[in-house]
């Protein structure tokens, strides 16, 4: 358990999806792409770029403006870093980098530094300046920014690139925060990214996910 979890487990759970579990998936997927060489870069980097872009958009348009109203200036460094990361990702995605492998390593260094800064500065500020219910309310607005097509791509990716413990935490949050009539759809998308045994393990620990029967 981290220090932030010990201080306020309820608030930590509310911010962790966007500032812990997505971050871990981004790190792991980028590491995988780097280790996989040119072929994997060509096939999988476009998806990584789309998901990272949307993640940054959600911060820039949803979470950061709300936080700036209560803690002016706290997200300034993250805003600047978003621009640096976006520029390098765009150059990689459009073939403008002369040395793809070297540029990917630069991206990893920049991205890791950026994510750590958010986890050490922005995430604690969210917990300091918002009640858990307010954070959940912001989280509940994510679908305003995400198309069903994006969510269908993102959810399998997310659950594939976090470990079993993180899957349980994210799934528990979804089981509570997602409308009951939409939960079966999300479950189908999540299951698409997992092996049958992994899905069985997850539904055993989060029974609410047993509503649908993935094929």
Regions from the PLM with identified roles:
Residues 1-215:
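Small-residue-biased structural context
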């Amino acid at each position: 358990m981290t220090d932030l979890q010990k201080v306020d487990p309820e608030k930590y759970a509310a911010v962790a999806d966007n500032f812990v579990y997505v971050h871990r998936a981004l790190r792991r997927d980028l590491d995988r792409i780097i280790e996989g060489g040119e072929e994997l870069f060509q096939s999988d980097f476009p998806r990584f770029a789309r998901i990272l872009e949307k993640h940054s958009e959600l911060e820039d348009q949803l979470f950061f403006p709300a936080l700036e109203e209560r803690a002016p200036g706290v997200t300034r460094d993250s805003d600047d870093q978003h621009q640096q990361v976006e520029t390098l990702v765009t150059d990689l995605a459009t073939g403008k980098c002369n040395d793809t492998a070297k540029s990917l390593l630069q991206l990893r260094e920049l991205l890791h530094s950026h994510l750590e800064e958010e986890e050490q500065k922005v995430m604690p500020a969210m917990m300091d300046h918002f009640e858990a219910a307010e954070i959940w309310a912001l989280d509940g607005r994510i679908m305003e920014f995400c198309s069903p097509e994006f969510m269908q791509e993102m959810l399998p990716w997310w659950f594939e690139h976090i470990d079993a413990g993180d899957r349980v935490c994210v799934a528990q949050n979804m089981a509570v925060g997602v409308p009951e009539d939409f939960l079966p759809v999300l479950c189908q998308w999540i299951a698409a990214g997992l092996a049958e045994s992994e899905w069985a393990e997850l539904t055993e620990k989060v029974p609410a996910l047993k509503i649908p029967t993935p094929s």
